[in-house]
Amino acid sequence: MGHLGRIRLFVRTIRTFLTNLKRHHGNDYASLGDLVLHYDKKSDGAFAVKPTESAKKLVELGDDSFYLVERFKEHESIARMDSYKHLVRLFTEQCIVEKDDNDNSNKVVIRASKDISSDSLQNPSDPDAGYCGHKGKGYQMQVMETYSKDKSQPNLITHIKVESANQSDANALIPAIEDAQSKELAPTELLADTLYGSDSNIEQAKELGVTVIAPVMGKKEGAMPLSAFTFDDNNLITACPEQQVPQRIKSDKGVTTVIFNKALCDVCPRQSECLVKREKKNCTLTYDDKAVRLTRRRAEEKSDEFKDSYRYRSGVEGTMSDLDRMTGLKHLRVRGMPQVCLAATMKATGLNILRIVAFKNRLKRPKKANKRSNPSLDRFLDAVKEQFRRMWNYFGGRDFCYA
C-alpha cells in the first residue's frame, strides 16, 4: 500500500471515483465538464506544489470533493458505489463545512493535521488500513506463542489477530487469552510487553486463570514509593517508612485516606521525599487499591525472580523476525482486512509446520558423545592453543634473515 500525503490522498480518491463514474455512468461523468480535466491524467505531477502553497491546494481539492459529494448524494446507484463512499468518508474526516458570514454560502475548511483521527482513510485502494505514529500506515498483527525453558516442547504460535495499525495493544490481551481458551490452548503464565500490562488487564487475566508478567506502565515512582509503607492484608497502611503509626484511617468508595500525627511529621528527617501531604492540622495520604497493586508490581520488577522470568519475552521478537524473513509477512500482495487476515493466518500456520519439523528432526538426531574426559586438561590445552595462535599471527607476517 502506497503512503500518501494529504494532497495525494485527495487526488487518488477523487480520481478513483471519477474513473468508476466514467465507466458506469458516462453521461453523469460528461456533465461535470472542466472539473475532470485535471484528474484524467494518471500522474500526480499536476498537483505537486511548494510547501507554502499546499494549504491553498488542499482547499481547492476540498472544494472539488464537496461539489462531487453534493452533486451525487441523491443519485441512488452512484451513492452505492464504494468509490463514492470513500470520497464521502475522506471529505467527512478531512474537511468541515462552515457558513460564510458575507453571503451565507457553504465554505469548506480543511481540518488541522492534529485533528485527523488515526482510523481515517489512508488510501482508497485499502480502506481498512489505519495509521500509527510509531508503526506507520497499514496493519498490525497480535501474536501469542508458547515457550519451554528446557526445550522439551516446540515453540508454536497459538493466537494471531490482524488489526488496523491504529488499534491499541492494551485492548488485545484479554481477547487473545479468551481466543486461546476457546481452543483449549490457554496459558497459565503469560509474558507481555508494557502496553499489555495495565492494571485492568492484569486483574481480568487473573479472573481467567492466567498470570500476566509485564512491566508497569506510567512514570517511575519517586525516592519514596508507596511500597515503602507497611500494609496489612486489607491494603491498609499500618506504619510509614519511619515506623510511625497512623492516627486514623478512612475508607470511602474504594479510596483510603490515612491521617498521621502532624507533630511527628514536622520533625521527620524524610519529609522532603515523603508522599504524605502536609495540611494545616494533619498530614494525610490518599490512595486506592489500584495504587497498591501497581506499587507492589514495581517493587517486584526489581527482583531477580521477575528478571529471570521476563527475559524469555524477547523470544517473540525472533518469531516476528521469522514471519518477516521466512514468510514475507510485512510485504503482502493483498489488500483489505479479510485478505490480509487469511494471508497472515496461512503464513503463521506455515511457520508452525516448519518449527514442528525442525523439532522432530532434532529429536531424531543422535546426541553427540561427550569427548571431554578431563575438563581441566582440556582447558589447559585450549589456553596453550590460544597463545600459540596469537604468536603465529604476530610473527607470521614478518620476514626473517638467517646467517
PLM feature spans:
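Anion-binding and metal-coordination hotspots
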Residues: 1-403
